[in-house]
């Protein structure tokens, strides 16, 4: 249910960086009129979607409208619609260097916890933007702060954090190259009303000994 909203959120924050809207918001707060702001575009940029599940696929379907080049990262690579290529998780460190935008939609497991650490950020393109809309513990928070301070990456859009609410003393709040949102990328109006039909469908499948559409694998944890 949240996939469409999360995908639109992702496209939105990418545009915040490419169209220099984040810069303009920061300048507005300072009442600073910056001449000759040069915008970029998403056209022909490289997008790495780490986690090619429903949310990742939804992001890619929208990214293709901007003619972005898209590679997906998946534990078990398969050909997927709209992706130019899908590679195994073992190749993540290779492809982060290729990407202009790295979007994390991975599930949190023992294998993926803190998969994005300082070493991984240092392998990214120094002009790259990191976006996390999945789980806070996929990222080593202290190490992304270090990477941002050292300009190992250009910026980040973070919707999830190790501790929520994000502590007021976190440096992330004050970084001008960081967009902080409050675990809200998937929140939509009338969410409860929209979940009821899904619940009824799953419940009816369960009572008829059929596999519900929303079942998860408890061993994989997703």
Feature names for model-found ranges:
Residues 10, 14, 99, 148, ...:
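Hydrophobic "lid"/C-terminal helical patch
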Residues 56-57:
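N-terminal Rossmann-fold NAD(P) dinucleotide-binding loop
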Residues 1-9, 23, 164-222:
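C-terminal helix-to-coil terminal segments
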Residues 77-171:
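Rossmann-like adenosine-cofactor binding region
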Residues 70-72:
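Short beta-strand "acidic-cap" motif of Rossmann-like dinucleotide-binding folds
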Residues 60, 64, 148-149:
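Gly/Ala-rich phosphate-binding loop of Rossmann-like dinucleotide-binding domains
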Residues 52-53:
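Glycine-rich Rossmann-fold phosphate-binding loop(s) that bind the pyrophosphate
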Residues 1-46, 65:
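Phosphate-binding beta-alpha-beta segment of Rossmann-like dinucleotide-binding domains, i.e.
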